[in-house]
């Protein structure tokens, strides 16, 4: 009797187990998740651009996860929210920045999303800009940002961006 009851219990549990997701179901779920993530991420980005324009470093830094890693062109990786906040404050202190980012794609699966996009930026040096820094320069580039949803909020946990600007040609000796 005990064996029979155990066998019936195992069969009942197996019958109640969720069916594996089909490829089509997964694609539909991920499309819906990606669409929702894109809408949310674009809203976060719009807020971040307002904070950036206003020089509000503290509000801007909150959009980064505590363990964020940011990799910018020609610079060491920035690790952690406090380091990112310090870098933002440093950069904003150099002068006036104007930036527009355009999201071109978001792929999401559960609490993770990857955003691809491009940016256009303009900089005008202020009195606290380091010696030798260009007084003004426009820039265009692209980025890939990894997002993690934490307690309902999308936070950046990895960001890599790079410029489309060409590296200046080195002076040739004797020419």
Name each model-derived stretch.
Residues 63, 69-79, 90-94:
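A short gly/proline-enriched turn/hairpin at secondary-structure junctions
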Residues 48, 60-61, 68, 80, ...:
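Hydrophobic pocket/interface hotspot
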Residues 64, 74, 110, 117-121, ...:
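A mature extracytoplasmic/lumenal domain signature
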Residues 17-21, 139-167:
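Short beta-strand edge/turn micro-motifs at domain boundaries
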Residues 1-6:
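Bacterial N-terminal signal peptides that target proteins for export
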Residues 16-66, 168-175:
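Short, low-complexity N-terminal intrinsically disordered segments enriched in polar/charged residues
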Residues 85-133:
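Surface-exposed, charged secondary-structure patches
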């Amino acid at each position: 009797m005990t064996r029979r009851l155990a066998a019936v219990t195992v069969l009942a549990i197996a019958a109640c187990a969720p069916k594996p997701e089909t490829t089509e179901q997964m694609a539909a779920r991920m499309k819906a998740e990606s669409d929702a993530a894109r809408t949310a991420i674009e809203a976060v980005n719009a807020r971040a651009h307002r904070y950036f324009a206003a020089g509000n470093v503290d509000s801007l830094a909150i959009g980064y996860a505590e363990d964020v890693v940011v990799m910018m062109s020609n610079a060491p990786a920035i690790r952690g929210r406090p380091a990112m906040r310090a870098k933002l404050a440093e950069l904003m202190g150099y002068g006036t920045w104007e930036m527009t980012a355009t999201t071109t794609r978001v792929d999401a699966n559960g609490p993770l999303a990857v955003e691809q996009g491009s940016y256009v930026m303009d900089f005008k040096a202020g009195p606290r800009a380091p010696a030798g820094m260009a007084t003004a320069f426009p820039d265009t580039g692209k980025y890939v940002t990894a997002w993690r949803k934490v307690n309902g909020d999308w936070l950046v946990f990895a960001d890599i961006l790079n410029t489309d600007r060409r590296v200046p040609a080195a002076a040739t000796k004797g020419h």
